[in-house]
Amino acid sequence: MQHGSLGPSSSSRKTTVTSTAGSVHLHHRSSNGFSTASRAQLNRHNEMDFGKMFAAMEKGHKVCKIAVLKKWDPAYKQLTLDRYSRQIFLTKLELSAVRNKPTILDIRQIREVQTLNYKLNTIKVDDKWKKDREIVNFDSKAILIISYGMGFALSYWILLFESEDACKLWSQGLHNLMMDTRDRDSSPHPLRIERFLHKHFLSLMSPANDAVARKHMKPFVQTSLQFKVQSDQLQQVTEDQMNSDQFSFASRQLIHVPELFSSRFADLAEKHERKGLVVTFQNFLRFLDGKQFDELASNRTRALEFLNRYFQEDQAYFGDRNEPSMTVFEFCDFLFSRENSLWDPTNEKVTHDMSRPLSHYWIASSHNTYLTGDQLRSESSLDCYAQALLMGCRCIELDCWDGQKKPGSAEFIDIVIYHGYTMTSKILLRDVLHVIRHYAFVTSEYPVILSIEDNCSVPAQRLLAQELKDILGDYLLTQPANREEKQLPSPAALKKKIIVKHKKLPIESEDLAAVVKTDEFQDTEIISRECVKKGILMVKNNNSHEWTSHVFILFPDRLCYLIQTADPENPNDDTVSVSGDEEREEETPSGFGVKPEEMHVTEEWFHGRCERDEAKKRILEHKEKGNGLFMIRDSNLFIGDFSLSILHDGKVHHVRIRSKIIDKEKKYYFMDNKVCDTLYELVSYYTRHYLTTAHFKMVLTIPCPQPQPHLNQPWFSATADKEKAEELLSLVPEDGAFLIRTSSTDSSVYVLSLKVDGEFWHYRLKRDGRIFVVNQKVFENLNQIVEFYANREFVRGISLRFPVNEKDISHLTAELAEARTPGCYMDLKDLDKEVQARALRPYRGTADDELSFPANVIITVLRKEEGLWRGRYGSLTGWFPSAHVQEILPEKVSTSETSNYNTIELAGTLIERIHDADRPNVIRISQSNQHWMNKQYYLLAASSSEEADGWQNNLFELTRSVNTKMSILRTKEKEKRIAAELSNLVVYCQAVPFDPAHIYNDAFYEMCSFVEGKLDKLVEKGLLPFNSRKLSRVYPNGSRITSNNYSPVPMWNAGCHMVALNYQTGDKPMQLNQGKFLANGRCGYLLKPDYMLTDDFDPTNTEKFATAYPIRLNVQVIGGRHLSRKDKNKGICSPFVEIEIIGMPCDTKVFQTKTIASNGLNPIWNQTFTFEIQCPEVALIRFHVEDGDFVGPKTDPFIGQAVFPVDSIRCGFRSVPLKNQYSEELELSSLLVDVQMCSREGTQLIRSSSHFLQASRLAPVFAHRKITNGDSIPREMAPRLRTSATDRSLDSPTNSESRATLLSGQRGSQDSMDSAAETSSIASGTISSRDGKKKQNWLKKFSFGKSSKS
């Protein structure tokens, strides 16, 4: 396939279609694909003409895609551009290639475009490039490196061009396209919509006619757009063959919900003689003023300029250039645009006062900055430092270790960075420092702190100090900013300076005792201790003979391994391969995995295998529905064909649907005059056109309902709601009790209610027409689901065991009561702490429902029966004899290291290499003095012979040493020494152990670091006043080997400055970190509110903060657009939104909306929630969207998230652009919310949270600006404030409840939709207070809460 068919030529003029009700108008944009503003900006930075540049890129160039330090395909490929979809294509040139479908890269995913010459000679890194013997022989100016990805770790296209000029052209062109595509200001929302639709048009169109066939639309709508579309609706908006404009028009028709505008903004619409309903410029200004509280409304010139940028000059104008208008659909698009974001763009600049001491700021900080994934096997990468710095991180970590020495000399030639004693790869310190120098001040000009985790010998430390000085040069801070200072300098005073954090030699003495003093607040996790070797080995269970993977840590006197298993076959999913070698075919959209030619399978009218007589019976059962009642079934006489059964004048007629092969494709028809590609299209055609036979002439009007074999089943209840279902399930004491019912809010939706671990879980069964999709398996009816999961795990090891309904419940409970021993059942779900037991000896279960486990492991007990307990070990759940375990009393349950690892003492052991039938490379460890007794031994297996040799040699050496000194263990670590050269570079961040006696001393330049679990103890010892004067850094427990993160909120609330997180992990803590540091221009420094700097500050008693300004925040979640999971092919999502305030313990609260079934394209919620926030200056608001349907062990319900500081959001009708787990913006995915903010008493309206809640922290230039805030509710707001959340719903447009009442008294949720029994707990705004039950220690007061189950 030639790329010429993939997109328009460079000279073509792109047109798109938008529509009002019944009207269409065309929009044109510049032929080079740039918006006007971005075109002018880019022309200033590039000497080449963009039109010619992009024309050359669209024509294409020959390249080889190469790989570093691995084999690669030397065949030439064609690299081409489609400027309108913003995609580049890599297509094989061989005409005989079987798979000639191009590899596609979306430019919005590109992070950097650099030539190899730029990396080697400008950034000055050698890294892997100099190690590759093939690459060093090529011209570095002809190699282009494209870094891309939507996570932290990046992938790469490394392309070798035929000439330097071609490489330079693509480097400049892609860089400019990347900046225009990714930059929030130069890619307006209408242009983003055009690109989105054009991309999908290219992926669906046929090269033969440059059109999309109707048969591809339903899979596209159900999979890509995530919308359960009805056949008649699709027929109305689509054509048999659609060009780009028709495809765009059809897609937009499906996206828009007319009621969204009519229920809220009808007063803004005016009739236009040619364009139907429009929003005039004057009404748009009225909207900005009255509903958005936007200062833009008062400046007509700026408002015009804003619309110019948004609509790109000529799109919005219907005549008078000074009186632009927009259609209703365009106005709704604007509501969901990022130009209308909840985020206040004034915070894109540095607005905080940056002249305060460093200890007054939170500082964005990274842990293990060099890692792309977990702490055992992942790759160390220079790009991780670049990415962290570009994200605004200001404190990065360097784990430094001795590198190579000169041959025959003790002098070191390099220092390496990696995670010591593990299989993580190594990178050179000098390369890292070059990258830091290059990227340190691109995003922010404020100081960067290097946290040196020094594991080097003293000679290597001298080299470390020399490389810091040589490479960082003038950026490196080596002298105080002011010799007379009595406190830490400010970020402004340290602009473009790099600060070294390290221990420092004592000034007055060579005695190093103070330096090596043990810090009780450091990480005590075993995996973090200094060791000889660390890695993953398999260990054999001597009873079950099963092999499991564990992390082993070798010390001089013992070998330890973590009880938690480590699966080397399944590395961290968050880690992205850095090879970028992904020559894979693009997935084609298919609804629920069904191909276009099989789309009839999901339709209500398709009945599959059904005999002629049975078909007649089914139709006559519903004959009251009248003529045109029909069904399609498999033909009994002609295998592979189908038959139509239809009701006409009380009689059932059967008509054969014929098929024939045309151009190697199967076609379907009744008559030769109409032939269709698919059965679905054929039936859809005759739902709008007459089918004429010898006996009748009629339209297929009503699908015959599917049979309902579930109605008389013992597990089905037609009347039970959520509460009744839980009441019935509670009568059955066993897990696995279940029933299926209809949803209280939608009778077409079925819900499975199931008892799991003593709790009641409710699953909405995902349905597409006649089929159900459960755990990615397809079922034709409910009976099949129940039969399938009757003896298979549905969730958490539970199958559907005990069917329940109103009719049979008494009989079932009598049977269970008779079979059980009375009084010995114990449900543990309500205990504050889990009951745990230690295995006294191993147990190997013989039945499927029994639990197997080795000795000395911890088992979570779920239930007890006489002689038999049920528990969970790892991911397994089952029954086991209680005599094999000993219960651990609650007060003795310990989280210490003794409970998470086992120890093999090396003293007196025999190390042998043996041959095992199960595994190669096996090492046996046994006691050397036990020859005939039933001795205990360990069998360990390595993944390779070389790895086994390494472990065996280390074990031999250490065992010999330990056996000669049985009574004396080797010292764990030698006295630490610090090179004077390195000590001299440490000025402000002098690392010392935390000492309560020194909190108030004058050593402001000292700082402490401590592990996350020590926060409680440190707060008790005076951490809060310490943090107002000196710096502190928190880092994760060493046991977090997957690089998962801890909650940073307790540490921020305690005033800790550098809360170091693993930036490579896209989890909730990192999302909160990204959201918090959006503020203050994303510079990485946030000024704390004044009340956190006082001596009496106490996060648990915020009521006494006189300087805090308590507020009431109302958030109505109106709707969403383009919501989908990452795996779109696994069904249409049913989204719900979780809204959470995270901050001080008293403020933390979460609400959840109801679930909208099978609609990710344009769901509507209309639910309002109220938050009372005592300390809004430190609070974050988090939106989290999930699929409410997803169940199963390998499913990810995540749809999107967004986090904003409460003091940085705008009021009014605003969009919430959603992001992925790594806080990268998703394409067009957003929520629409209505946000109102006022004083907690409800008397003062807050128009701008940024200026009002940040007032005491703003720089003078911003603080002196005139702000209208804290006013009484203005007169022009009265009409809106008299409208409650219920007023603006789609269901009830008129209601007289006043907004003033809402602001002053509303607690919980005002749900404008049907609040039937099933959703009452959600719709009423059921909350889960974050402080909840009183905790025993300070840290737990800040733990994340969970929303209430619904």
UniProtKB/Swiss-Prot annotation:
Which residues lie within the region annotated Disordered? 1-40, 570-594, 1270-1350
User: What does the UniProt entry report for the null mutant?
Assistant: RNAi-mediated knockdown causes sterility resulting from impaired spermatheca dilatation causing a defect in ovulation, and a severe decrease in sheath cell basal and peak ovulatory contractions. The few embryos laid are arrested at the embryonic stage. Cycles of posterior body wall muscle contractions are prolonged and arrhythmic resulting in a defecation defect. Ca(2+) oscillations in intestinal cells are arrhythmic and the whole cell current amplitude is severely reduced.
Gene Ontology cellular component annotations, sorted alphabetically:
ruffle membrane
Q: In which tissues is it expressed?
A: Expressed in intestine, isthmus of the pharynx, proximal gonad sheath cells, spermatheca and uterine sheath cells. In males, expressed in the valve cell, the vas deferens and retractor and ventral protactor muscles.
Q: What are the GO MF terms of this UniProt record?
A: metal ion binding; phosphatidylinositol-4,5-bisphosphate phospholipase C activity
Biological-process GO terms, alphabetical: phosphatidylinositol metabolic process; phosphatidylinositol-mediated signaling; phospholipid catabolic process; positive regulation of epithelial cell migration; release of sequestered calcium ion into cytosol; sleep
Mind telling me which InterPro entries this protein's record contains?
C2_dom (IPR000008), C2_domain_sf (IPR035892), PH_domain (IPR001849), PI-PLC_fam (IPR001192), PLC-gamma (IPR016279), PLC-gamma_C-SH2 (IPR035023), PLC-gamma_N-SH2 (IPR035024), PLC-like_Pdiesterase_TIM-brl (IPR017946)
Which segments constitute the PI-PLC X-box domain? 352-503
| Domain of life according to the entry | Eukaryota
Q: Tell me where in this chain the PH domain is found.
A: 855-960
EC class (word): hydrolase
Q: Which residues form the SH3 domain?
A: 832-890
Active-site residues (renumbered): H367, H419
Please list the reactions this protein catalyses. a 1,2-diacyl-sn-glycero-3-phospho-(1D-myo-inositol-4,5-bisphosphate) + H2O = 1D-myo-inositol 1,4,5-trisphosphate + a 1,2-diacyl-sn-glycerol + H(+)
SH2 domain span: 605-704, 715-804
Q: Where is the composition biased (Low complexity)?
A: 9-20, 1340-1350
C2 domain: residues covered: 1099-1220
Protein function: Mediates the production of the second messenger molecules diacylglycerol (DAG) and inositol 1,4,5-trisphosphate (IP3) which plays an important role in the regulation of intracellular signaling cascades. Regulates basal and ovulatory sheath cell contractions by controlling Ca(2+) oscillations via IP3-mediated activation of IP3 receptor itr-1.
Q: What is this protein called?
A: 1-phosphatidylinositol 4,5-bisphosphate phosphodiesterase gamma plc-3
